[in-house]
Swiss-Prot record:
Substrate binds at residues 156, 168. GO terms for biological process: purine nucleoside catabolic process. InterPro entries: Inosine/uridine_hydrolase_dom, IUNH, Ribo_hydro-like. It catalyses: a pyrimidine ribonucleoside + H2O = a pyrimidine nucleobase + D-ribose. The gene is rihB. This is Putative pyrimidine-specific ribonucleoside hydrolase RihB. Keywords: Glycosidase, Hydrolase. Belongs to the IUNH family. RihB subfamily. GO terms for cellular component: cytosol. It comes from Shigella boydii serotype 4 (strain Sb227). GO terms for molecular function: purine nucleosidase activity; ribosylpyrimidine nucleosidase activity. Its EC number is 3.2.2.8.
Length: 242
């Protein structure tokens, strides 16, 4: 394991800067994440979908420690990678670059994969108009969305000169709710773990020139009207249940 890489230039020192949260009342779980993944999957009937929205270190270690979990995973829908430009290096997206070797383990595991990468998530650009829409939806969820995304828009402008910021992780949940809202294409995807400018790149064989069987459904486009409608529905739904 190498030294942890963080994106505090985008998400702040806490990883979730912007909102002001109340003091924590829940303690951290005593069980290690890798053991929890293994135990949970081994006790399942193969009906669990994993949705990692960060580096794949824990899942990769679990796969290596207990290969018997592989047939227990119905699917992995992950936020990470790109078939175009990266966002942490010119070649690599942050979640994959943070642990390319772990990503390689996952992408070669044989488990059904859906890669929701930057090419798709960058289509969900959150603008001040979107923030205002969620504020109008009201309640603590609308306020939380506003606090997080106003901070994100600030850092996106400071770092990249962009007037808006994408909402990456929620697209994975959107895919689970309605796969038809996201167009995917089956491709062979390989993670570059060679030292150099392409380290951490998800090499996507879009045209099939390598002749290797596809191992990943890669997100191509998203119905943004549907997506923002879903986000607003969730914001309003929180008000009704709390």
């Amino acid at each position: 394991m190498r030294k942890q890489i963080v994106a505090d230039n985008i998400h702040g020192e806490t990883g979730l800067d912007g909102p002001v949260f109340e003091s924590l009342t829940r303690q951290a779980e005593s069980t290690h994440a890798v053991k929890y993944i293994i135990d949970t999957l081994m006790a399942s009937d193969g009906d669990i979908t994993l949705v990692p929205v960060g580096p794949l270190s824990n899942i990769a270690v679990a796969m290596r420690m207990q290969p018997a979990i592989l047939p227990k995973i119905r699917e992995i829908v992950l936020m990470g990678g790109a078939y175009g430009t990266g966002n942490f290096t010119p070649s690599a997206e942050f979640n994959i670059f943070a642990d390319p070797e772990a990503a390689r383990v996952v992408f070669t595991s044989g488990v059904p994969l859906v890669m929701i990468g930057l090419d798709l998530t960058n289509q969900t650009v959150c603008t001040p108009d979107v923030i205002a829409r969620m504020e109008r939806a009201g309640g603590p969820a609308g306020e939380l969305f506003s606090d997080i995304m106003n901070f994100t828009l600030k850092t996106q402008f400071e770092n990249y000169g962009l007037a808006g910021g994408p909402v990456h992780d929620a697209t994975c949940i959107g895919y689970l709710i309605n796969p038809d809202g996201i167009k995917t294409q089956e491709m062979y995807v390989e993670v570059d773990v060679n030292s150099g400018p392409c380290y951490g790149r998800t090499v996507c064989d879009e045209l099939g020139v390598l002749g290797k069987p596809a191992n990943t459904k890669v997100g191509i486009t998203i119905d943004t009207d549907w997506f923002w409608g879903l986000v607003e529905e969730c914001v309003r739904g929180y008000i009704k249940t709390h």
